[in-house]
Amino acid sequence: NRDILPDWFRKPRKMAQLLGGDLIDVKLNPDDVKDTWWTQEHISLDAYSRYFIPKYISEEKVLYLDADLLVLKDLEDVFEIDMKGHPIAAVMDTDNQSFNSGVLLIDNGLWKRENMTEQLVNETNGLLQQALEGNIPKFNGDQTIFNKVFRDRWLALDKRMNLQVGHDVTAFM
């Protein structure tokens, strides 16, 4: 996060520890996410924080989950998924042409070796002007960027891992 006060983490951290987990407050470098990057009603600048996960987390595999997700079962098996040489795994979006960036299983080592953060930042800087000029229909912030950078390099996860109840019917009408 960029600006959540440390006090906010006390109670959730205690709850996580009671369940055998932990909650770690990682502060992003203010220079990572640019204030000029595209935001929308449903996309804050913090959405772009996903680009920098490998910079701050050292584990070989990382599971990113959007804050609005409801987890209904143990996620341990997710870390056993064979990534088959893909830097990320995600769920196909409701348009059946792209993936949704709300659930990302990241091969951290591969991401780092292939400088994916740099590719995402460069693509963001390059596409934002086009989006502002209206040259990219249905531009959806970081999700559009993720899909461009990883277009043929992602593994599809079971749709139950990011089921969008109701949204699947109305999203692209």
For the regions a language model picked out, list residue spans one by one.
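GT-A fold catalytic core of metal-dependent nucleotide-sugar glycosyltransferases
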Residues: 25-29, 46-114
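Short internal beta-strands
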Residues: 1-3, 90
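Short, intrinsically disordered, charge-balanced linker/junction segments flanking boundaries
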Residues: 16-24, 89, 167-173
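Short, glycine/charged-enriched secondary-structure capping and boundary segments
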Residues: 11-13, 77-80, 119
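Active-site-proximal specificity loops/subdomain of glycosyltransferases
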Residues: 5-56
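Residues at alpha-helix caps and immediate loop-helix transition turns in enzyme cores, especially N-
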Residues: 7-11, 74, 142
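Alpha-helix N-cap/loop-to-helix initiation residues
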Residues: 4-5, 71
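Catalytic core and acceptor-binding pocket of nucleotide-sugar-dependent glycosyltransferases
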Residues: 94-173
